Every structure is written in C-alpha cells, then in structure tokens.
Amino acid sequence: MNQLILASQSPRRKELLDLAGFSYDIQASHLKEEINRNLSPAENVQWLAEQKANDIQRLNPKAVVIGADTIVAIDGKCLGKPKDKKEAAFMLQLLSGKTHQVLTGVTVQSENRKETFYEQTEVTFWTLTQNEIDRYIETGEPLDKAGSYGIQGKGALFVQKIDGDYFSVVGLPIAKTVRVLETFGITPF
C-alpha cells in the first residue's frame, strides 16, 4: 500500500482524515500562501493546492500526497488568512450580512498521476455588530483561518445559511477527497 501524506498542518484537515479512518503522515509544505490577483478564486485554490502537493511530492516520490487550500471570496475579492487582528476585523465587517463563497482546492498526487479539483460553498452571515467582531477576534480563533472565521468553532454563530459542502468550508471536502483517493488505491477505514 502506498504511503499517504497530508501536505498541511491544518488541525481541521487532520481531523477530517482521521474521521474517515485514513492512515497517513503529515509533512507540511512551507510555501508562502500568496493569493495571485491575476487568477480567479477557483484557479487560486487549485494552484495553491498543487504547489503544496508538488513541494512534498518532490521529497517523497513514492507517496500519494494531498495538498489543499481554502479561500473565501466576496464580490470577486479573495480573502486568505488575516495578517493581524485589524485585517481580521476588516474581513469580518466585509462578510457581515452578506453571502460569500468558500472555495477549497485539493490536489491528490502520486509519482505519475495528479488530480486537482475544488468545491465551492455559499455561506451567508448574519449582520454582525462591532462588539461581536471584537469579542470574536479576542478569542484568537479567526487569526489562522481564511476569511477570518472557523465554521466549526465560534464562527458558526455568525452563519445564517450554508449551501454546499460543510466540510469544504472546514478545510477539506472529505467525501470527494475519499473518492479521488480510492482511484489512487488508498482507502479509508
């Protein structure tokens, strides 16, 4: 059986692979995650997922590697992880009372094959008060998440509606990822 490697330090992606029952190793890619303003949100997440998978694949040519990236898009603007509390507040104000898209790109790659895809989910936020935003930022939760919120944590309190794959918003569309991994000969549980 091929070795499976997750090219991410995301605890949420780890939890989802654990939930599915995979045996895998973690080797985080240390590539700088920069959004390319010349690419669409869908192109960005797929490109970043491929870069992460390529980075780890070079070091482990016999392994099957999963690279993933998540961004939030609103009004054509891509939101990655905030640089600081001020940027987190700006992002949350931007999302307040509106519908945005959460896109997660995934690359599954072996020595001689690569499959890249993305999932897009629509998320609508309630209108947020500045007090709610400030209190949420003080928890520290939004500082390592695309769009400055975690739907699986306290950020769930901001979500009015979701249309699409919840797990994609968390960081990995696990059902589709499992199906792709199975075509590489990697099966869960």
From Swiss-Prot:
Active site, UniProt feature: D69 (proton acceptor)
Alphabetized InterPro entries for the sequence: ITPase-like_fam (IPR029001), Maf-like (IPR003697)
GO biological process: nucleotide metabolic process
Catalytic activity, reaction form: dTTP + H2O = dTMP + diphosphate + H(+); UTP + H2O = UMP + diphosphate + H(+)
The keyword Kinase is annotated on this UniProt entry: no
Cofactor: a divalent metal cation
Recorded superkingdom: Bacteria
Annotated localization: Cytoplasm
Site keyed Important for substrate specificity: positions: R12, T70, Q152
Any one Gene Ontology cellular component term annotated for this protein: cytoplasm
Pfam families: Maf
Main location: cytoplasm
GO molecular function, one term: dTTP diphosphatase activity
Keywords: Cytoplasm, Hydrolase, Nucleotide metabolism
The protein's Enzyme Commission number: 3.6.1.9
HAMAP family in alphabetical order: Maf (MF_00528)
Family membership: Belongs to the Maf family. YhdE subfamily.
Function text: Nucleoside triphosphate pyrophosphatase that hydrolyzes dTTP and UTP. May have a dual role in cell division arrest and in preventing the incorporation of modified nucleotides into cellular nucleic acids.
The protein's name in its UniProt record: dTTP/UTP pyrophosphatase
Gene designation: maf
